[in-house]
Swiss-Prot record:
Family: Belongs to the GreA/GreB family.
Taxonomic lineage from the root: Bacteria, Bacillati, Bacillota, Bacilli, Bacillales
Pfam family, one: GreA_GreB_N
Coiled coil (UniProt feature): 4-75
GO molecular function, one term: DNA binding
The protein's name: Transcription elongation factor GreA
Organism: Staphylococcus saprophyticus subsp. saprophyticus (strain ATCC 15305 / DSM 20229 / NCIMB 8711 / NCTC 7292 / S-41)
Function field: Necessary for efficient RNA polymerase transcription elongation past template-encoded arresting sites. The arresting sites in DNA have the property of trapping a certain fraction of elongating RNA polymerases that pass through, resulting in locked ternary complexes. Cleavage of the nascent transcript by cleavage factors such as GreA or GreB allows the resumption of elongation from the new 3'terminus. GreA releases sequences of 2 to 3 nucleotides.
Length: 158
């Protein structure tokens, strides 16, 4: 049997995926079935754009259901170790770009629940890879997409 990719995530991320799956199965799937039913009533399916669009949408929804089910089945829940001295998956880290004083806060999560707009960065991102394993007051070099790098200081871990 082939090894399945594991998806590290917080308990909150796991519950969010469970909610997404429930929504897909109980709301989205029935909605698209109804759209298909209505489109079929228009007659000739060979030139029925509403039917084609609804079938395409159904395919996307079924793919989403499979994707979320796979992620839940292979989820690796991140337990809080209570160690706030080292940056780890699931921890929230506050950094300051050097030289400077402006603080930025990020929670390091699995790729399945990353959301940069909410300050949740993937453990696979260059920033997280640079920070994981580092300690409070460490200065860290973080690679940038353009090939450059920035220096940051870890000022808080929680």
């Amino acid at each position: 049997m082939e090894n399945q990719k594991q998806y590290p995530m917080t308990q909150e991320g796991f519950e969010k995926l469970e909610h997404e799956l429930e929504e897909l199965k109980t709301v989205k799937r029935p909605e698209v079935v109804e759209k298909i039913k209505i489109a079929r009533s228009f007659g000739d399916l060979s030139e029925n754009s509403e039917y084609d669009a609804a079938k395409d949408e159904q395919g996307f929804i079924e793919q989403d259901i499979q994707r979320v089910e796979n992620m839940l089945r292979n989820a690796l829940i991140i337990e809080d170790t209570g160690n706030n001295n080292e940056v780890q998956l699931g921890k929230t880290v506050t950094i300051v770009e050097l030289p400077g004083e402006e603080e930025e806060e990020y929670q390091i999560v699995g790729s399945a629940e990353s959301d940069a707009f909410k300050g949740k960065i993937s453990n696979e991102s260059p920033m997280a890879k640079s920070l994981i394993g580092k300690k409070l007051d460490d200065e860290v070099r973080v690679p940038l997409p353009n090939g450059g790098e920035i220096n940051v200081k870890i000022v808080n871990i929680k």
